[in-house]
Amino acid sequence: MRTGEIKALSGLRIVAAVWVVLFHFRPLLEQAAPGFRSALAPVLDCGAQGVDLFFILSGFVLTWNYLDRMGDSFSLRSTLHFLWLRLSRVWPVYLVTMHLAALWIIFTLNVGHVPSEAAGSLTAMNYVRQFLLVQLWFAPYFDGTSWDGPAWSISAEWLAYLLFGALVLVIFRIARATRARGLFFLAVAASLPPVVLLMATGLFYTPWSWLPRIIMQFTAGALVCAAVRKLDPSDRARMGAGIASLLLAATIVGILYWLDAHPVPTIYDSAGLVDVLFVPLVSTLAIGAGTLPAMLSLRPMVYLGHISFSLYMVHELVHTTWNWMVLQFELQLGSDLAGKALLLALFAIAVAGAVLLYHLVEEPARKWMRSMMKPPRDTRQDSGHGRLQTIDGQREDRRSVVSARAG
């Protein structure tokens, strides 16, 4: 049974999170650091693709940790236990940022002359939907579904978690009958529907486009994980995979710059085409050594990967607060030294908020929620067929597994 943290993928999480953060902070970068914004425009303008990378990572990580324990046969108790463990990962930070966002909207209604545009969404039904993580399920577009903007992807992730109990049964049987190479090609194929829709419409953001994004990217992550689990690469092969991951990352960046200079006339969001390279990137990082995998596996990168979910959830609150202050107090973010210092301060506040959320909310609440459930008994463990057969027979902390969240 393969479990344990793949550090390079933990490090990849912070890369994806920062990609999304910079995407949302583009207007601020344009004002305070126009040269930086212009130089990195092809990469920053498609930062929303970081969410697709998160979806693939989530499917990979859950399959990495649960394929053997949930794939052989269905167990309602094990599935419910799994879902509670998933909630313990995402719900605490999600609920805190959700309520902070709601309180901020109320604050703007009572202080100053610039009420939040989201004030009309403060309804009882909207609260219940967001509390239960189902707000996105009723909307064709994710904009405006959540008081804390990035929370839409957590609602999408929750749908994937609910489907995982059935998906893992299918993946287990496909993996049993398919070689690693076949599983890899299936994973690439599973990641294609959002790209095909993009090519058909020219837009990445269309009605209900979030649904194939989460379902198919999550499934692609699960399939490529099943492929990786079958591999036993030599040291030389691992080094080769590491070099391949570096080349893939460079290729993704190169394609983004090429598409920026030579846009496809019929595809407005042509940068979304790079999604087809995410599955190969994740797979090579998972088995690779040296170069890019080694850099992403450094302790600071792994720690930042651990707090990436909190950063993902809190950064838009900082951004929204600043936008309100600009209108309320008629502030301007200049390109001088003071403007750059203020921009760095906003980033620092977001990171500090993420650190506080991780240490004061995310980890303590996760452990508290886990303590409420007894692990499901698995007789296979008693019979000696595996040393880790129950869902929480593996100690699911930061030292032993990769976190599986869209953030």
Task: Locate the predicted segments by residue.
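Membrane-interface helix caps and helix-loop-helix hairpins in membrane proteins
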Residues: 143-148, 199-209, 258-268
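Membrane-embedded alpha-helical segments in integral membrane proteins
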Residues: 105, 192-199, 251-259
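Short, amphipathic, aromatic/basic-enriched membrane-interface segments that mark the entry/exit
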Residues: 151-154, 208, 239
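The cytoplasmic-loop to transmembrane-helix boundary for the fourth helix
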Residues: 182-185, 238-243
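Membrane-cytosol interface segments of multi-pass membrane proteins
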Residues: 1-196, 214, 295, 302, ...
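Alpha-helical transmembrane segments of multi-pass integral membrane proteins
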Residues: 48, 214, 218, 222-223, ...
